[in-house]
From Swiss-Prot:
Organism placement in taxonomy: Bacteria, Bacillati, Mycoplasmatota, Mollicutes, Acholeplasmatales
PANTHER family assigned to the protein according to its UniProt record, in alphabetical order: 40S RIBOSOMAL PROTEIN S11 FAMILY MEMBER, SMALL RIBOSOMAL SUBUNIT PROTEIN US17M
Its job: One of the primary rRNA binding proteins, it binds specifically to the 5'-end of 16S ribosomal RNA.
Organism field: Phytoplasma mali (strain AT)
Entry-linked SUPFAM superfamilies: Nucleic acid-binding proteins
Pfam family, one: Ribosomal_S17
Protein name: Small ribosomal subunit protein uS17
NCBIfam families per UniProt: PRK05610.1, uS17_bact
A single GO molecular function term of this UniProt record: rRNA binding
Assembly notes: Part of the 30S ribosomal subunit.
GO CC annotation, single: cytosolic small ribosomal subunit
CDD domains to which the protein is assigned, alphabetical: Ribosomal_uS17
Gene3D superfamilies for this protein: Nucleic acid-binding proteins
Length: 89
């Protein structure tokens, strides 16, 4: 698979409890063709986070890669938005 043809997704981190792995949810909103109602569909991905910088609540970008384990087939590209509630000023 060429590096340029790999899929890139954006989603929210919902869990960071595993070592070097985060769970990300990607929400897709589609309009129902028959009734016209907007329907939300979500999908979970396991993403490899080598540096363990992504935390729960962050908005991240990740891309498809070779299989890293039975369930991990994506790796972290960048953290788009970081929710820094833990920092004290």
């Amino acid at each position: 698979m060429l590096r340029n043809s790999r899929k890139i997704f954006t989603g929210n981190v919902v869990s960071d409890k595993m070592n070097k792995t985060i769970t990300v949810v990607v929400n897709v909103y589609k309009k129902d063709l028959l009734y016209g109602k907007i329907v939300k569909k979500s999908r979970k991905f396991y993403v490899h986070d080598e540096t363990e910088k992504a935390k729960k609540g962050n908005l991240i970008s990740f891309m498809e890669t070779r299989p890293l384990s039975k369930t991990k087939k994506f790796r972290l590209l960048k953290i788009i938005f970081s929710n820094d509630k833990d920092k004290k000023q």
